[in-house]
Amino acid sequence: MMNKFCEHFVVGIIKWKLFTNWEGNMVRILFLLHDLGQGGAEKVLVNLVNNMDRSKFDITVITLFGGGVNEQFLLPHIRYQTVFKRMIPGNSKLMKLLSPQQLHRLFVKEQYDIEIAYLEGPSARVISGCCSPNTGLISWVHGEQRTRAAASRSFRSEREALDCYNRFNQVVCVSDTVKRDFESIIRLDHESIVLYNTVESEQIRELSKDDAPEVIDDGCTKLVAVGTLKEVKGFDRLLRIMKRLKDEGKMVHLYLLGQGKLAQQFEQFSVENRLDDRVTMLGYQTNPYKYVAKCDLFVCSSYSEGFSTAATEALIVGTPVVTTLVSGMKEMLGENNEYGLVTENSEEALYQGIKQLLDHPDLLDHYRKQAAIRGKMFSTENTVRAVEEMLMNLNVGLDDDSKR
């Protein structure tokens, strides 16, 4: 009997060692997302996994498509895999040909304690296909969906979207606004939670001290905007506002950081409207902070956001923020504009907000001081600890009735 016990014990130890990858009793975590491009959510994921406790978590990041600019910033201990080396045109439609379970079997080859879809849409559909009762599933929602049709765009139907999201043990939203929006559209079996984005605050402050010779002293108030050059960021209306301000004789210069499909269109608009001397397009920058820190005002012109990483970073370096009313901004800047100026989500309102700050330097100076105060609330340690506690609690809970 003792020999039989020893045999079972040794086999059990071997199985346990294989499962934990010979790295002790660590929690194996998978983060899956579309790619590691220049978007805010992608940058936030890198910040998060790089700062998680490597003695407790064995982390793998899988992207459906490779080639993203944020891949280079993953620390060496983070396992990184891509399903496809480059983006495949029409991939969302192609993936709908397969069920979530089939996609999961194709894309996820190992066993994990917790699997996280770090963006809504295709990533959530894949992770919802996990069939292991011993694996905790988390869906991370970064942006407002507004309608059930929009939330279901990457799914075969609205019914499939509802079924998939309700397979997750936990849904995490990046702001209260996103949480209210998502829960009004997707009826979850349990309440979602809010966890704020992780930013590298100390590193950002240090990098912001670097020289930025492109930012010139031309007697203009310097505006800065950062983001992918796509429709949702609203840079088209920001450029129209710049034309209007110049026509009115306002001395203002916009520095636009980012790359994307609308770059050529924006450059053409600047030339046609004689904004060459008032708009500088700097493309994608690995260190945007040095530019933001040397400008007088950060502008978020977006039609929609989750919890703006770029606006958060502006506050961290002490640059005042004016923004359209998108999700997370009231939480970030205060219900009554205590820490920055939030306008209605329209071109006219944003124009009036920028003009107000240009016409009242004392108000701009006030928000510069308030930005420095608010920027101190964004702590890398606190946001990472909150995520780690959620993961550990979920992992423990998988041993009880919370199993799917």
Task: Give residue ranges: language-model regions.
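Aromatic "clamp/platform" in nucleotide-sugar-dependent glycosyltransferases that forms part
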Residues: Y284, Y303
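A conserved mid-protein helix/loop that constitutes part of the nucleotide-sugar donor-binding site
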Residues: E42-N47, T221-K250, K261-E267
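Short hydrophobic beta-strand element within catalytic cores of glycosyltransferases
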Residues: P320-T323
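A short, active-site helix/loop in glycosyltransferases that binds the activated sugar's phosphate group
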Residues: R125-I127, N166-S192, V199-Q203
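Nucleotide-sugar donor phosphate/pyrophosphate-binding loop at the beta->alpha transition
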Residues: M95-Q101, G136, Q145-R167
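N-terminal strand-loop element at the rim of the active site
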Residues: F31-G39, K43-N47, N51-L94, S192
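Conserved acidic donor-binding segment of nucleotide-sugar-dependent glycosyltransferases
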Residues: E335-E347, Q356-P361
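Short His-centered aromatic/hydrophobic patch
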Residues: A117-S123, V141
